[in-house]
Amino acid sequence: MYVIGRSFKFANQFENIDLNMVYVVASFHDLAHHIDKDNHEVLSANLFYLNEKMKEFFTYEQRGIIKDAIEDHRASLDHEPRSIYGKIISSADRNVDIISSLKRTHAYTIKHYPELDLNEMINRAYNHISEKFGDCGYAKVWLVDEEFDKFKNDVKELLKDKYTFGIKYMEVNNIIDTKEKKKIKTL
């Protein structure tokens, strides 16, 4: 619902936007994430494009635009989205909350890197958030987004001090062991 709501917020900034297309792009954009995280945008776009019901509602041209928009939503996309619908979904899909970023990064780390100790988890989270949302981060928005701008400023502030970052990471993820807190001073 988060991405759908943000998509409508962005869509309302423009005239002649088909809100049905916006809704479908937002609804399908991560549909295949559970199948293959690394290629989910292509798989999700294909699930949409091959869906017989969608062929009843949208023209061939509209379906092509929707497919392209779904493919273009990734934060790591190396080019500008091909349509306004791609810019809307790509911008809407950006996280604007530091707490959820820290929680998502922690959950991903625990699942995919269970061997890491606390310092390594914090370092991984620090590096990931810096690479994605820092000054030269790859996550972009293609439309005016004051929420994302504020989020980027919050991230910039948090990344200034690794120790403060580590404390915040632990607080957000309910890591309260005081022995562990002492360990992060070595970061």
Task: Go through the PLM ranges and name each one.
Residues 1-21, 34, 43, 48-56:
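Alpha-helical phosphate/pyrophosphate-handling elements in metalloenzyme active cores
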Residues 39, 45, 50, 106, ...:
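General N-terminal targeting signals
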